[in-house]
């Protein structure tokens, strides 16, 4: 319902029970729906393990008003364009999508673009040109992840849908993103030593002779920072924590390896 004020901002008893079950099962991510602010994120954070991530679904105008605090508090956001369009209007969604992707990049947080990306493939074995362009646009804008829902869950052609999306992603990523400097220069910096080291090598990351950036990470923090820069080289993350390895696989350009033999006593994260 457009412009509806949602009054709840606390986890229900069932929510807490579901979260505890997810923790017990070893889930890597918890997704939160219909957020209005960061309160549910902070409450959820107290109930999950340190190496579990939170995905915050952006679905209403209230979340947009508080988006900075939401992005700072969460690990990833999902742009749920269907419900968002109902609340703010379809014509507003494209510019909001671009704005959210840029904001997430500034704070080194991953962003998922979702809803009806290949909707026609629920019933048909080929996509429309508009759908292909929609996927490509999200990639050009800098999205970490593009997502299928009903196309893969209940559609008649799930394999073809995944294949179509994969081909579109690979084809689009070959094209040089001239706006990449915007991402490279927009990362918010502070006195964090990891960020300082990262910024010192950012130009090298765009050197065509550099084939890969190897990130050794206990927490996934360095992988997020490197991914946010959208380097030309592939990013290989090595972590002793299998949950971290799975989480960083959501990030743009990251290939993760779980290595139980690797430990880092000197520093939490580093890269080369």
Predicted regions and their residues:
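Non-catalytic helical/linker scaffolds that mediate oligomerization, partner binding
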Residues: 1-264
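Single conserved hydrophobic/aromatic residue that forms the stacking wall/gate
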Residues: 262-272
